[in-house]
Design a protein with these regions (language model features):
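Short, Lys/Arg-enriched N-terminal segment that forms or immediately precedes the first helix
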Residues: 11-12, 138-147
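Short beta-strand segments in beta-sandwich/barrel cores
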Residues: 35, 62-67, 84, 108-109
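Glycine- and acidic-residue-biased ligand/ion/polar-headgroup-sensing regions
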Residues: 42, 53-64, 81-82
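Short phosphate-coordinating micro-motif centered on Lys-Gly-acidic
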Residues: 45-50
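Phosphate-/nucleic-acid-contacting segments
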Residues: 152-200
Length: 200
C-alpha cells in the first residue's frame, strides 16, 4: 500500500487491518482524526526542541529519525511505506524532543494527533487496542534494534536489515545506513562486499 492518493478512509482501513478490527462506526471515528501531511525531500517533520504531538504513518516516502551526540549525527530509525514513527519520549512526556525527523524523499504521511486519539480511545475499545498495539510495536522495534547493536556482528546487522527492510537498503543513503547500524561507512562497504560474495 504505497499509493500517495490514498484517502483517510483507506488509511483508517489499513491501520485497522494491521492493528485492530473495527466496526464501521469506529472506522468513521478513526478516519476523522487522521491528518494528511506532505513533505518535500529534505523537509523537517520534527525539529530538535519541538514537542512531538503525533504518531505518523508513512503512505509514501522515506523518513529519518536522528539525534546529535558529541557533535555527531546518529541515525536512530528510518521509516518507509506502511510504517509508524514518532519521537516516543517527547510524545508521552510532552517535553521538547532531543531527536529530529526529516524526509529523505518526497513523503506523504497521515498523522494521528495524540490528544484526539486518546480522546476517542476512551470511548472506542478497538481504537484503544489500536493505540496500545502501535505503542507496543514501537517499543519492540526499539528493543530489537538495541539488541541487534549489542549482540550482532557488523555483517549480521547488515544481513538482518537487508532481510527485514530491503527497500530501506536500496533507497537510503549509505552514510545513514552505516549510522543506523552503528558502523563506519568503510565498515559498511566491507560488509556489503562480504554479503555479495556470500551470494555468489
Amino acid at each position: 500500500m504505497s499509493n500517495p492518493t490514498l484517502t483517510p478512509r483507506d488509511v483508517a482501513r489499513e491501520l485497522a487491518r494491521r492493528y485492530s478490527t473495527m466496526t464501521h462506526d469506529e472506522l468513521d471515528i478513526l478516519e476523522s482524526v487522521l491528518v494528511p501531511m506532505k513533505f518535500a525531500k529534505g523537509d523537517k517533520i520534527l525539529a530538535e526542541g519541538d514537542v512531538c504531538k503525533h504518531i505518523y504513518w508513512v503512505v509514501k516516502g522515506l523518513v529519518r529519525q536522528y539525534y546529535f551526540k558529541n557533535g555527531k549525527e546518529l541515525t536512530e530509525y528510518m521509516a518507509t511505506e506502511n510504517t509508524i514513527f514518532m519521537s516516543i519520549e517527547s510524545l508521552f512526556k510532552e517535553e521538547p524532543s532531543k531527536q529530529m525527523i526529516h524526509a529523505l524523499e518526497p513523503t506523504v504521511i497521515y498523522a494521528l494527533p495524540k490528544k484526539e486519539l486518546e480522546a476517542v480511545a476512551i470511548r472506542c475499545v478497538n481504537i484503544q487496542m489500536l493505540y496500545r498495539k502501535i505503542l507496543e510495536e514501537s517499543l519492540i522495534i526499539s528493543q530489537r534494534h538495541a539488541d541487534m547493536l549489542r549482540f550482532e556482528s557488523a555483517l549480521d546487522r547488515y544481513r538482518k536489515l537487508v532481510k527485514s527492510n530491503p527497500q530501506l537498503v536500496l533507497r537510503a543513503p549509505l552514510v545513514y545506513i552505516a549510522s543506523y547500524l552503528q558502523m563506519t561507512p568503510e565498515t559498511l562497504s566491507r560488509v556489503r562486499t562480504a554479503a555479495l560474495v556470500e551470494k555468489e
